[in-house]
Amino acid sequence: MAIVGLGTDIVEIERITAHVARSGDKLAKRVLTEAEFDIYQQHSQPSRYLAKRFAAKEAAAKALGTGIGRGVSFQHIHIGNTPDGAPTIDFTQGAQQRLALLNGVVGHISIADEKSYAIATVILESR
């Protein structure tokens, strides 16, 4: 296997908190898949959850080489968790098509947060 994509993103959590205070769930509905949005609504720290998902999806889009847009939307990238809590990443639609163009077969993701920031790194591997 070879690395075919690498992306990292960092988000200031307070920016997300301020956006949610101003616009309600508008950003969350744009960024999160339906399943992620359900978790967001029940989360004890929804802005922190949203910031981590935002960073993860931006990192994934960078790893794909497109950024958000150009055929890849936030909705095409789903961030989940294993039963042990480790983050997982799944691609659909435009993101899956772009991954296939790179001969990618799997994405690895790491997400971290500390007080003011959320950060994510995505590595894409080929066959």
Curated annotation (Swiss-Prot):
Q: What class of enzyme is it?
A: transferase
> Under which EC number(s) is this enzyme classified?
2.7.8.7
Mainly resides where? cytoplasm
The coiled-coil regions, if any, are none
Reaction catalyzed: apo-[ACP] + CoA = holo-[ACP] + adenosine 3',5'-bisphosphate + H(+)
Q: Which GO terms describe its molecular function?
A: holo-[acyl-carrier-protein] synthase activity; magnesium ion binding
Keywords assigned by UniProt, alphabetized: Cytoplasm, Fatty acid biosynthesis, Fatty acid metabolism, Lipid biosynthesis, Lipid metabolism, Magnesium, Metal-binding, Transferase
Name the cofactor(s) required for activity, per the record.
Answer: Mg(2+)
What Pfam families does this protein's entry cite? ACPS
Recorded GO CC terms? cytoplasm
One GO biological process term is: fatty acid biosynthetic process
* Localization (cell): Cytoplasm
**Where Mg(2+) is bound, by residue?**
D9, E58
- Listed InterPro entries: 4-PPantetheinyl_Trfase_dom (IPR008278), 4-PPantetheinyl_Trfase_dom_sf (IPR037143), ACPS (IPR002582), Ppantetheine-prot_Trfase_dom (IPR004568)
- Is Iron found in the keyword set? no
The protein's matches in SUPFAM superfamilies, at most eight in alphabetical order, are given as:
4'-phosphopantetheinyl transferase (SSF56214)
Q: What does this protein do?
A: Transfers the 4'-phosphopantetheine moiety from coenzyme A to a Ser of acyl-carrier-protein.
- Per the similarity annotation, which family is this? Belongs to the P-Pant transferase superfamily. AcpS family.
Protein name in UniProt: Holo-[acyl-carrier-protein] synthase
Give the source species: Shewanella sp. (strain MR-4)
Provide the gene name from the record: acpS
